[in-house]
Amino acid sequence: MNLPLLEVWKCWTTPEDIVHWNNASDDWHTPWAENNLQPGGKFTYRMEAKDGSFGFDFWGIYDKVIPYEKIEYTLGDGRKGSVLFSADDHSTLVVESFEAEETNPIELQRNGWQAILDNFKKYALK
């Protein structure tokens, strides 16, 4: 995306920003987020259907944090994930990888995570 790395990192890691982009569809939202961005630190995002019919805490523990470069984490169910940031003078690339869970089809999971990334980009570019 056409934003400097520092701005992208802030939008990705700041709870006040996370609540604006962390949803996979328009009928869901994140009413609050907590983020202790350091190895051993915990993140929790409260994800809820806007109609109040369902909600859950999406959480994990940071395994490795290299500021402005890499975040590795373990989700509450033990799956691993990572986010890589790379930049040149005018743009920043964000790549998120995750271990799929076994309940839902991989394509459905990929589409959900991609929708969140798309919402992140839309929010960050405002």
Feature annotation, model-predicted:
Residues 1-4, 48, 65, 86, ...:
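Solvent-exposed residues in well-ordered beta-strands and their adjoining turns
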Residues 1-28:
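Hydrophobic ligand-binding cavity/cleft-lining segments
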Residues 5-6, 37-38, 63-68, 84-93:
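A short, structured loop/turn motif at beta-sheet edges
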Residues 8-9, 18, 43-45, 62, ...:
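Hydrophobic pocket/interface hotspot
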Residues 28-31, 80-82:
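Short structured motifs
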Residues 29-72:
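Glycine-rich portal/gate segments that line the openings of hydrophobic small-molecule binding cavities
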Residues 70-115, 120:
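Beta-strand/loop substructures that line and gate deep hydrophobic ligand-binding cavities in soluble
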Residues 123-126:
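Short, highly charged C-terminal tails/helix-capping segments
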